[in-house]
């Protein structure tokens, strides 16, 4: 910094300044975000819509993966409630975060574990999470086990299922719902292609079959969130995840300044703000492109000229090029 003519700041002082900047950066991000109404509580049965996710990053001086950033994000205002930095082996679980009554924890299938769901329910919050085969035992009201693939096999393309189930958790049996949506054939083929690439020879027949569906588990009551709204809510989480992956590529999310949670929080807000600014600039192409070529005044329609002059905008006559003939 000193070489660039800027003040010389010690690492500790810079760390403290970043910590104090969090409220300011958060406020800037909240002002810049363009989807606040999408995550508003009134659209989701009064729930505070909170998405959790983890992303792999590199620490300073690293040549490979050596850290994960775990985030809890309020979708309504893109407020980061919690950020944790772990080594590359830090698992994805709801238990990393504190939960509060009225929150809806939304996450992908990595978070579908009995202990994680129990942690959220113990805080009087609810979950909306992608279902994963074999992770949590589900049964019907009579206690009979439910084979999820059998339960959804009758669905035609585009059809949905909203099935009351009971989940076996560490604290006992908890009521919930299985939400299923049969995907179009094109989407099924794309999902299966990703599974072949990710799992290779380890891909099981049941997982291959499950690619036909979007399968969700929720503890939210039907009166608050019906099946369609659950699917739309999960889709919103997925869209925001894609947006963050794009920002990660554009803004250098993959290089941590250090592995302190508080510094990383300010750093992430600054990166998100940069991503929002880039998106805002990209949405105004006329300001970034060369100015448009305007017609000469002499080519303007006479009624346009009269209108301009009537509002005290005197229009100068076009300059005429004169040719001077010099005597030989």
Residue ranges and their predicted role:
Residues 9, 13, 18, 29, ...:
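Single, function-defining residue in the core of a domain
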Residues 51-52, 106:
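Short hydrophobic beta-strand that contains or immediately precedes a catalytic carboxylate
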Residues 1-49, 55, 317-318:
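Gly/serine-rich nucleotide phosphate-binding loop at the start of the catalytic core
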């Amino acid at each position: 910094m000193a070489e660039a003519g800027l003040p010389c700041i010690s690492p500790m002082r810079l760390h403290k300044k970043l910590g104090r900047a969090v409220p300011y950066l958060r406020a800037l991000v909240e002002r810049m975000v363009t989807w606040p109404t999408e995550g508003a509580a009134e659209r989701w049965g009064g729930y505070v819509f909170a998405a959790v996710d983890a992303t792999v990053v590199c620490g300073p001086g690293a040549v490979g993966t050596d850290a994960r950033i775990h985030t809890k994000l309020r979708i309504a205002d893109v407020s980061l409630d919690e950020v944790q930095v772990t080594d590359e082996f830090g698992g994805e679980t709801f238990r990393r975060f504190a939960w509060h009554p009225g929150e809806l924890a939304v996450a992908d299938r990595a978070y579908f574990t009995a202990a994680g769901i129990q942690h959220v329910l113990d805080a009087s919050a609810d979950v909306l999470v992608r279902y994963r085969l074999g992770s949590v035992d589900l049964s019907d009201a009579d206690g009979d086990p439910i084979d999820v693939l059998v339960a959804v096999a009758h669905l035609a393309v585009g059809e949905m299922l909203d099935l009351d189930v009971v989940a076996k958790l560490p604290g006992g049996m908890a009521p919930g719902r299985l939400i299923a949506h049969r995907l179009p054939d094109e989407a099924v083929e794309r999902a299966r292609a990703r599974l072949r690439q990710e799992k290779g020879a380890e891909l099981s027949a049941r997982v291959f079959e499950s690619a036909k569906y979007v399968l969700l588990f929720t503890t939210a009551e039907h009166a608050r969130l019906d099946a369609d709204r659950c699917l739309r809510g999960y889709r919103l989480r997925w869209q925001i995840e894609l947006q963050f992956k794009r920002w990660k590529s554009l803004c250098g999310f993959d290089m941590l300044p250090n592995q302190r949670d508080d510094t990383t929080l300010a750093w992430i807000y600054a990166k998100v703000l940069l991503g929002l600014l880039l998106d805002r600039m990209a949405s105004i192409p006329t300001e970034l492109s060369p100015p448009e070529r305007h017609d000469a005044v002499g080519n303007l329609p006479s009624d346009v000229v009269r209108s301009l002059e009537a509002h005290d905008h005197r229009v100068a006559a076009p300059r005429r090029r004169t040719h001077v003939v010099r005597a030989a």
